[in-house]
Curated annotation (Swiss-Prot):
Superkingdom of this protein's organism: Eukaryota
Gene source species: Drosophila melanogaster (Fruit fly)
Residues of the transit peptide: 1-22
Protein name: Single-stranded DNA-binding protein, mitochondrial
InterPro entries the record matches: NA-bd_OB-fold, Primosome_PriB/ssb, ssDNA-bd
Pfam families for this protein: SSB
Length: 146
């Protein structure tokens, strides 16, 4: 658990890895019970803006957003589309550099990783809950006309 906390600290200025949504943190020499858990997410969508390099020189991180859509059909036959925006962070050095150099706004991409929660303090001092996907892999797709 300490490794995860150290890894998330440099994410953004003001980002704190705090327990959220029922999460708890425990510290002990050995846990009372060891069991396997799974925190895996895969999204396929379009990049909202060119990736940005953030963090510090010692702890760089690349962030970008991905839009996914859900289509709905109403009883009257009309269609609606809901867009969800996902915040993606990349810590892995080689993946981070590749994403920063090659991934562009509007490009179709698939991200595999895990979900993490925390809080961000904005410039006015207000705290907001932050949900991010820590990328383990990012796949790039080219449009047929490119």
């Amino acid at each position: 658990m300490q490794h995860t906390r150290r890894m998330l600290n440099p994410l953004l200025t003001g980002l704190r890895n705090l327990p959220a949504r029922g999460a708890t943190t425990t510290t002990a020499a050995a846990p009372a019970k060891v069991e396997k858990t799974v925190n895996t997410v895969t999204i396929l969508g379009r990049v909202g803006a060119d990736p940005q390099l953030r963090g510090s020189q010692e702890h760089p991180v690349v962030t970008f957003s991905v839009a996914t859509h859900t289509n709905y059909k109403y009883e009257n036959g009309d269609w609606a589309q809901r867009t969800d925006w996902h915040r993606v962070v990349v810590f892995k050095p080689n993946l981070r550099d590749t994403v920063l150099e090659y991934l562009k706004k509007g490009q179709r991409t698939m991200v595999q990783g895990k979900i993490t929660y925390g809080e961000i303090t904005d410039q006015q001092g207000n705290q907001k809950t932050s949900t991010s996907i820590i990328a383990d892999d990012v796949l790039f797709f080219r449009d047929a006309n490119n």
